[in-house]
Amino acid sequence: MSDNSKIEWTDATWNPVRGCSKISPGCVNCYAETFAERFRGVPGHPYEYGFDLRLVPEKLAEPIRWRTPKMVFVNSMSDLFQEDVADEYIVSVVRVMQLANWHTYQILTKRSERMRDMLKTKLKFAASLPHIWWGVSVENKKHGLQRIDHLQASPARIRFLSIEPLLEDIGRF
């Protein structure tokens, strides 16, 4: 976690999940993987296992301890909705966001179909919360446009797009 993020559009990052698997061309030059792999094998480092998927339940309560309101990028070093993260764990992460409602949370995923489906079911309680923003990554037409469709079909109150890395013209949508 960092509560002094160098990412210009957020104040803090919160990573209750670490690591990810590649699912599309937008993952090829992943900054998070490059960063994490530098520390593979360093005992005691948060990324001693590189970019291998790891749940970090000891990080769950972190936003509750931050008393000053922040814009929080959730899982800057992972994707909360990747297939190997259990629904129950995702719900636990979102429950913390519901509780620590003085922050604004930015959730960004390439697994838009799962996010949409969970927002209609197990995360329905959080879909309309104004302090949780639900977003998708868009890198090309093949993957990005369907993610936009999934986001539009979700009940999310606040939606956003991250159009990076933009690998081709995606046209008008």
What are these regions (language model features)?
Residues L55-F173:
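Conserved AdoMet/S-adenosylmethionine-binding subsite of the radical SAM
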Residues M1-V72, D79:
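N-terminal [4Fe-4S]-dependent radical SAM core
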